[in-house]
Amino acid sequence: MRMKKRKLLLLGVVCAALYACSTDQTNESGKRVSALDDAAWNHSEWISVANAPVITGEINGSNERAADGAAWFVSVVRNEKEITSARWMTTGLGVYELYVNGKLIGEEILKPGFTHPYKTKRSFTYEVSNALSKQAGAENVFAVQVTPGWWADKIITYSGQQGMVGAKVAFRGVLELTYADGSKAYLGSNTSDWKAGIAGPVKHAAIFDGEEYDARELPGYDTLDKLSTPEKNTEFEGEILPSNGGEVYFREDLALSPQKAYLWKGVTGESEDAYGKVVITKEYAAGEEMVVHPGETLVVDFGQNCAAVPAFEFMAKEGTQLNCRPSEILNDGNGAKSRGMDGPEGSCHRLNLRTPDTGMLLDYTFADHKDYTTYRPHRTFYGYRFVSITADQEVRIRSIQSIPVSSITQQMETGSITTGNKLVNQLISNTLWGQRSNYLSVPTDCPQRNERLGWTADTQVFAETGTFFANTADFFHKWMRDMRDTQSPTGAYPGVAPLAQYGASPTDMNRLGWSDAGVIVPWVVWKQFGDTQIIDENWAAMEKYLNHINETKYDHHALSAENGNYQWADWLSYEPLESCSGRHTAKDGSGTLPETYDYWNYLSANYWLIDAGMMSDMARATGRDAEKYEAMAAQAKQYILDKFLNADGEFKTAIFNTMQTPALFALKNKLVEGVAKENMMKRLRDNFAEHGNCLQTGFLGTSILMPTLTENGMSDIAYELLFQRKNPSWLYSVDNGATTIWERWNSYMLDKGMGPQGMNSFNHYAYGCVCEWMWETMAGISADTSEPGFKRIIMKPIPDKRLEFVNAEYNSAAGIIKSSWKYEGDQWIWDFAIPEGAVALVTLPGESQAHQYRAGSYQIVK
């Protein structure tokens, strides 16, 4: 059906409901429904604000901010007939929000989400009839606000590249009206029936920049005089797909209240080498109203680091400006500059955000409210535990909360695991909060600094852990589309997906351990959920990738045009040859060490072997050629044996024999056996002893550390590493007050202060991969690839008395699985439950023989 022209009515639009509604209300109208047929898009076009401000010139450096202002698009429609239903299919170039008659539509935020900016946009369709006046002749106001996030901001812009330069935000939508007589009409965005302009209270908003909000301004649907004819936007020529995974929500169920709050004014102990210590003038009790005056700073501690936004209920005179600055950590040690502090002890530390003065801001200007008003940012997010609040006139804060933001909803969460050890429980909590914070439209690395990208190694090392805590199948279907969109013509996968400010350039491809996420993630989703659709969707892309690395033997030099002659490798490890620290290069400045190239080629060959084995599994599950990949895996294994290992289990590159990660990959991939294996295991045990029972591994080595030790009879070492509290270890961060997983083992050190500020996140989930081992070894719940999706469960708990007990419950694809054990004296008591339709292969501690159990609840005493 062709769209019937509708005249925009600009005069006489006076609706009390419009003026009563704030653009930051949280009670939504509109239920999300299935998308209209693709053909419906033919009734619409992309529209932008004519002469809208854009970023010009070349982007260099990290401080470039998005263009100011929010674009509003408004159409007023008179009903030709009585309406019975209305579906509105929408998408945007930039973060957009929908309003019908002043009512905010939908509970999803940050729409349309983070995708490849030029290849894919996601659409959201809502049933909006409840927000309409339905009678014939009634008028309804459809309005959209769009800000630069995901499209015209720094997150997608390479230094010196186009990206946000010249980009205009845009909207596209189709409204399907069904009338009482059964007929339908389609009304689409166009340049004749819509008005557009830069208007409203949002003065600036972007993913990295934060949000500036002036409550004195009315929303765009109330200021039609500021709007004019839009222009057609032709910047996006990609595909629009219905959103089905990766949507972002406020987690109201996890709302955080202040655990501590205080005012400070002035500093003592300041010197040339130290910022000193804040002078606290008042501490607030829980629930007490907080008052901030000019010259004072209010610090609020919510007790939990996470991706979130502050939500205020506050009051001040018209024109008062409040500035809120989030941070992950406080300055300490009298603000000693030698400790990396950026302010006095007790103040919020923001240097690790990398743009502390120009990014991650929240500025609010008060309107002439006679009473308390509410506000929270909707068009950005922050990563923080603390906020620092100042104001230029008195502000009274009746309530402030931190509202977590995530793609993991309460309904998606599937697993809980607790022990009798408080430190281990905190580590589990830190991991879960890291997942909630970083599964945000894409699996990001961190939510706080000017990065927030879909780093592919972070994703693959944590993927299996994440499947226990939440049903991530749809989330990863969406992200694997981002991976395919960003895949190179040769088949190489990127360092980040989707395309972003860095990590996905033509020389950031085929980075070992990163590129392999293109195979590892679909394999994990298939194994954990029994999902073969993800294999089918990605098979051609995975096959192209495997053919490419097989032809080149994943050799670093052969792929140097794609990898930029650099590898991240076992990122942030404490071992020799680590890349970030520069230990991979010669001390005389002559460049990369020959041993480093050997290391990179050894690791990449191991991933070639891993990838081929996973492809064989997935081929067999979907009726494809598994033998091809079995042969490829055998070829990769022989290549590693010939090139890197001696017959006695020693590495040909001598320095490998002093490291943990090379041995772990050799053991994981069964490269050694017999005496050679015994020799390697002895060297590995000795290595741990030499390092005081501390791990030395980075992102890649840590991901295989605990399972590999356990599979090779070294669960005693695995438990020593779990309980270790020295640096580096998991519990070192717990002892230092962490509430999420850190990027570095030493992101903060009690004796030395902050880690390197140029790259120092306190909310990185990668090292939370230890929880995969907790689920599969401590609790003894793992999937069997012979019958994926937990139809066949491997239950092989390995207990340790220091835990006292473990209680684990997992709502798997096959149903609820339970495993709980405890010690009573020397007696070990294990209760476990298997869901209907599933079977379990049960192996008791200290035994090797597995016994099959069918659905039911059981207790074993040993």
At which residue positions do the language-model features occur?
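Bacterial N-terminal signal peptides that target proteins for export
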Residues: 2-9
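Helix-terminus loop motifs that line ligand-binding clefts
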Residues: 107-118, 329-357, 473-590, 729-752
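Extracellular/oxidizing-compartment recognition motifs
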Residues: 25-449, 474-475, 497-499, 533, ...
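Active-site acid/base region of carbohydrate-active enzymes
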Residues: 95, 189-198, 394-430, 436-437, ...
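Non-catalytic C-terminal accessory modules of carbohydrate-active enzymes
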Residues: 163, 167-174, 187-225, 234-235, ...
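C-terminal motif of bacterial Sec signal peptides marking the signal peptidase cleavage site
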Residues: 19-20
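Alpha-helical support elements that line or immediately flank enzyme active sites
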Residues: 86-87, 309-328, 387-390, 458-487, ...
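C-terminal capping/lid segments that line or modulate ligand- or cofactor-binding pockets
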Residues: 142, 213, 450-451, 469, ...
